[in-house]
């Protein structure tokens, strides 16, 4: 491996390529003599577009092919949306760098209505996220929630074709693609608790590759890393994947980390919520403790029902 080359494994969607190019630009700024190459590839999650994500099954739908490239030495790092990163990694790989978080909120997108409250009874809202579905149904049980797959451009086209009255996307993704004007309103965490790691970019690499880890070190954002660590620790304890009705969002107030979380039945009939505060140095323990609280309130029954539904479909 030449010392002045680094290869980035990335998905081929416009948003994934934006994220990979962002990391590429950061590295080029830090190391002007470094040659940074993109290695675009297709993942299973990109191919299976006619099935709701929760029913596709398995974890790491958007990362496994990238991880294989790392293990086989075809790439040096993989760039991910943190909300797509599974709770476990293959032996020898790990998440070493989390870049500064962008806006973590969900976006309400519609051509006719300015907010969720304005939607008439029976309006059709598109999202494949069980997390978004359960919160939408709990708040507006009179709406029709339908699955919506594809990249951001595909989803917007389906909205524009009249298939949906509104759709829910991530604010960060729309901003990164220069589509901020499509956002009618951003949903606060109180209205729609974000996904674990939403708005943050993570970088995975071989744990024994000291050269790469040293190059990546300046890209790590400690405050973001602590927040995401708490969110992911909670998700790990709940044994949650990417396609589960779990929301988790941490904020920093000085040295205090405030973590909020929910586990919801996809039909909106039940929502288990909790929150916990503690010193930022205890981020992982805060996440685990909050997960234990949710489990004690009955979260495991909701999650088991979701897993049973996805495995039997």
From Swiss-Prot:
Q: Name one GO molecular function term.
A: hydroxymethylbilane synthase activity
List residues, modification S-(dipyrrolylmethanemethyl)cysteine: 242
| InterPro entries in the cross-refs | HemC, Porphobilin_deaminase_cofac_BS, Porphobilin_deaminase_N, Porphobilinogen_deaminase_C, Porphobilinogen_deaminase_C_sf
Tell me the protein's name.
Porphobilinogen deaminase
Q: What does this protein do?
A: Tetrapolymerization of the monopyrrole PBG into the hydroxymethylbilane pre-uroporphyrinogen in several discrete steps.
On whether Cell division is a keyword of this UniProt record, the answer is no
Under the heading CDD domains, the entry gives: PBP2_EcHMBS_like
* Keywords associated with the record: Porphyrin biosynthesis, Transferase
Whose protein is this, by species? Answer: Pectobacterium carotovorum subsp. carotovorum (strain PC1)
EC identifiers of the protein: 2.5.1.61
Which note does the record give on the cofactor? Binds 1 dipyrromethane group covalently.
GO terms for cellular component: cytoplasm
The pathway that the record names for this protein is: Porphyrin-containing compound metabolism; protoporphyrin-IX biosynthesis; coproporphyrinogen-III from 5-aminolevulinate: step 2/4
